[in-house]
């Protein structure tokens, strides 16, 4: 199996930054909900490149996205 991104909703909603959505190379994969104030992943489209994890963890120091095995994913991509 492969890895896909998963947003940690409670952590992500603290920042309301939307930066990760700007860097995902796959269209309509990493999106943002204004209602919940957090990003979410369409795990069926996620290619597992982990660029969003790099942006969130390394550049922004927020640790709101993690990579999980595709077999353990949920459709919404939010934990």
From Swiss-Prot:
4Fe-4S ferredoxin-type domain ranges (all copies): 3-35, 37-65
Essential cofactor(s): [4Fe-4S] cluster
Domain of life of the source: Bacteria
Keywords: 4Fe-4S, Electron transport, Iron, Iron-sulfur, Metal-binding, Oxidoreductase, Repeat, Transport
Binding-site positions, [4Fe-4S] cluster 1: 12, 17, 20, 56
Top EC class, one word: oxidoreductase
Bilayer-crossing regions: none
Coiled coil start-end: none
Textual note on the cofactor: Binds 2 [4Fe-4S] clusters.
InterPro entries on file: 4Fe4S_Fe-S-bd
Stored Pfam families: Fer4_10
Residue sites binding [4Fe-4S] cluster 2 per the record: 24, 46, 49, 52
GO molecular function: 4 iron, 4 sulfur cluster binding; metal ion binding; oxidoreductase activity
Subunit (UniProt): Heterotetramer of one alpha, one beta, one delta and one gamma chain.
Protein name, per record: Ferredoxin oxidoreductase 1 subunit ForD
Organism: Aquifex aeolicus (strain VF5)
Classification of source organism: Bacteria, Pseudomonadati, Aquificota, Aquificia, Aquificales
Gene designation per UniProt: forD1
């Amino acid at each position: 199996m492969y890895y896909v991104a998963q947003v940690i909703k409670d952590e992500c909603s603290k920042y309301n930054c939307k930066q990760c959505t700007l860097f995902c190379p796959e269209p309509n994969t990493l999106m943002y909900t204004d209602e919940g104030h957090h990003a979410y992943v369409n795990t069926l489209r996620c290619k597992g490149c982990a660029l969003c994890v790099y942006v969130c963890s390394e550049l922004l120091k927020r640790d709101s996205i993690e990579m999980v095995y595709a077999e353990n994913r949920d459709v919404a991509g939010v934990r």
